[in-house]
Amino acid sequence: MKNNSIRTVVATGIGAALFIIICIFVNIPIFGNTSIQLQYAVQVLFSVIFGSRSIIGFFMGFIGQVLKDGIQYGDISWAWVLASGITGLVIGLFGKKYDVTMGKFSVMSMIWFNLAQALGLLIAYGVVTPIGDKIQFAQAWSYLYAQSFVAGVANFITIAIGGTLLLAIYASSRTQSGSLTKG
């Protein structure tokens, strides 16, 4: 149990650090304070690899987004922090449907993965960010939903392409169970 705790803390710390670095240095602005964020593909990898501890995906996004907002903007948007965490959490919760640690990432696994990420993003950017920003910043609903929609779609595309590729590469690097036999 102790090793799992250490592994969880280390994975969360490394994941949050990668989240911040990628978010700050690799982003493509598209609308307001919204940009294409490639760190979500890496968050997916951590969320799935440590899926049985999906809390890693949550805290990687949560801590990473808090620190990124603080460093980059000097102000923290708690709704977007929660959205980043929820994205990692939901993807991790469904991780058994697309367990890449066994060396397989089939078409059906890819479909499950993208359905899970769509659900996570729908909750995060369809509900949490517009309502949270309305409470925190009192902005117009039309702006909030437009910004959340753009971010959700951009993140879906990023995760669908980048996340799927990272998971496929990771799966191909793992030994499939039963693939080693006596010759």
Curated annotation (Swiss-Prot):
The transmembrane residues are: 11-31, 44-64, 74-94, 111-131, 149-169
Q: What GO cellular component entries does it have?
A: plasma membrane
Q: Which UniProt keywords apply?
A: Cell membrane, Membrane, Transmembrane, Transmembrane helix
Q: Which PANTHER family match?
A: UPF0397 PROTEIN BC_2624-RELATED, UPF0397 PROTEIN SPR0429
NCBIfam families the UniProt entry points to? PRK13661.1
> Out of the domains of life, which is the source?
Bacteria
Q: Which family does it belong to?
A: Belongs to the UPF0397 family.
What is the protein's given name?
Answer: UPF0397 protein stu0306/stu0307
Pfam families, A to Z: ECF-ribofla_trS
Q: How does it sit in the membrane?
A: Multi-pass membrane protein
Can you name the source organism?
A: Streptococcus thermophilus (strain ATCC BAA-250 / LMG 18311)
Subcellular location per UniProt equals: Cell membrane
Please tell me whether the keyword DNA damage is annotated for this protein: no
